[in-house]
Amino acid sequence: MGTVGRVRLIRPAVALVTALSLITVTASASRPPERPVIALTDVLPAVAEASPAPGDGFRLTSGTVITASGAAAPVAGRLAEALRPGTGFPLPVVADSGARAIALVLEPGHPDEGYRLDIGPAGVTLRATRPAGLFAGVQTLRQLLPPEIESDAPQRRRWVLPAGTIVDAPRYAYRGAMLDLARHFHEPAEIRRYLDQLSRFKINHLHLHLSDDQGWRIRIDSWPKLTEVGGAPGTGVGGAGGGFLTKDDYRELVRYAADRFITIVPEIDMPGHVNAAQVAYPELTCDGVAPRPRTDMRVGYSSLCVSADVTYRFAEDVIRELAEMTPGPYLHVGGDEAMSTPHGSYLTFQKRVLPLVRKYGKIPYGWHEIAQSPSAAGAVIQFWGRERNSPSVATAVAAGSRVVLSPANRSYLDMKYDMLTPGGLAWAGYIEVRTAYDWDPARLLSDVPESAILGVEAPLWSETLRDSGDIDFLAFPRLVAIAELGWSPRAAHDWSSFRARLGAYGPRWIRDGVGFHRSPQINWS
């Protein structure tokens, strides 16, 4: 265990990735300018309904414009930014035009985040009730054009969208990813890069794990030593993860995510996983003695002092400051692996802390252990277990709680793909792409009805991560499997279709410089 902190993921050499990219570009240049039109169903995640039409689709030309007004205009601007590099076309965004157009329209009548995309030779119309629905439709539209359209240099190609109609909406309201900043700190630029990739697959929540035994990664003004000590150099697993987010950093990430219709969910883990906080403030221990800093990967040894008033002053200050700078509805209070907190004390803690989240206008959110507390009624419960039933979660659901599913043996992105995977962990088993894909959220917990499922989330813990390349390698392509489970209807769940669509997406990741795992289960283009 002592060497784990020095483990780094071994990704394909930069030279190899560059060579592959050059091969792709060279091959593209040697092909005829026309290629087969991508089908309406060749999209990740799978669309709900697709009705191809005979005849020609819509051809982008130098005269094409994008029309949008009001709240639709920013989404139209992002579409134009994505399509200009490869086409070399100006693609101006205008309020109205008689020219050949891609029109983005806000109108009533569509499901929340849903959209309708109509494509014909005379034009394209994308309709939704909310800007989030338009943004989801834009992600679909981008995938209906060849990967080269978003390259850095204009391509000599005729860009054609397939004719027909797509009507689409998400299966679940919550489709999330989690990134652990505590075990290893990831800089804001790395988080923004991850947000960019998440948004391509209609992920709409990013859960940031901001504190743990090894580090504290968010500035709290009323307790400044949390980051001065818990975010100092030498913190993190193996001592290789120093750093923290200032409040300005955090607010900018919230804004950046919101521009991509992603909600940030902050997490402060307690009453366990608090060693870093106790190193900074020994009064948070029952004996007033600071524990030693920890850079190993063990869990379950730390606990706040449940009988001390200072514990609740600390908890309230942290919750209040986080709530003030978090516009999203959720605030995650952890609650997992509190093995050093006696059961009665754990219930006492949750009885006092969960109402504090509501006091500051947020919905309490926690790992499924909080379901043991009657105070968790109405909270969001994040199930991370491997069992097929959970009586405490079922009881919380009966009292009004909703559930986000993150089964460790299906959705934990830090698990190895197989026994030869460099980096990553294996305590929940190996998770190849098909393992991540082949489950139904509605049937995971036998004692929880689908009506209580808010959605799914794919956590990525950072014990063996060090940089964006490590994030890429473990998150992709498995995160796309979880995204499809969250967005696409149950009827669209088909491994053969998914693996074909995933394999065809590979050139887009190569273009974006994403060092994804080339799973042998997938025939990569």
Question: What residues fall within each predicted segment?
Answer:
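Hydrophobic faces of well-ordered beta-strands that scaffold small-molecule active sites
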Residues: 175-179, 206-208, 264-268, 331-333, ...
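Active-site beta-loop-alpha junctions enriched in small/polar residues
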Residues: 182, 211-215, 269-273, 336-338, ...
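Conserved, mostly hydrophobic/aromatic
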Residues: 66, 83, 130, 177, ...
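Acidic, contiguous N-terminal accessory segments
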Residues: 3, 9-11, 15, 19-21, ...
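Feature activates predominantly on carbohydrate-active enzymes
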Residues: 112-300, 310-312, 320-323, 327-330
